[in-house]
Amino acid sequence: GISRRQQREIVREGADDRNFARFQRAYESRRQPVQNPRIVYQGCPGAYSEQAARNFFGPDIAPIGLRHFEDVFVAIKEGKADYGVVPIENNSTGAIRQIYDLLSHYEFYLVGETTVPVEHCLMAPAGATLDTITHVYSHEQGLFQSEKFLNTHPDWIQTPLADTAGSAKYVAESGDITKAAICSARAAEIYGLNILVTGVNYS
C-alpha cells in the first residue's frame, strides 16, 4: 500500500503522465470493506461514473448522484457517504486536474480503480432526425471527445452542461426535436431518448 503522505506528495507534484502512472501503481491494497456502503458519484443516473460505481461495488448497489465533483468530496467529509467515485483520467484528455486538486485539498485516500469504456451516442426525443437538430448538449469533455463528428455538423450550437447523463435528462424533459444530447446508450434507455448515431467519439 501507500501512505496518505505519499499520495499527497504525488498530488502536489502535479497531474502529469509520470505522476499519474505513480498514482495507478499506488492504490491502497489494504482497503477495509464497509458493509452496505453509501456511495456517491458526480452526475445523474446513466453517467459513466455511475457505471464505474456499479462495476467496482457490484450491480445491486444504489449509488447517489451529486451535481459537482466537489459535492462528492464534501459528502464523504461530512460522513454522508463512505465512498466516492470520480474519474481520474480519460484516454482523450489524460489526467483530470480538478480531481487531483480535490484529492490534495481534502487529503482523501484512493482505494481502488475500475475502467469504463466510453462510447458516446447522439440521442434525441422521438421524431428527431439529424436534419431537425440545431442544438447539442453534453459535458464539455463529451463535446471535446466528439469533436470530429460535431465538425461534420458545423451549424449545430454546442452547449456544455454539468454532465453527460444530465444532458440526456435535459433533452428528454424538453421534448424538443431540435435538441440532442451526447452521452451513454444507458442514458438514452433511462430517459427515453432515441439513439441517432452511436460511437460519435470514435468518428
Residue spans of the language-model regions?
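Domain-level signature for soluble enzymes in the chorismate/prephenate branch of the shikimate pathway
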Residues: 1-203
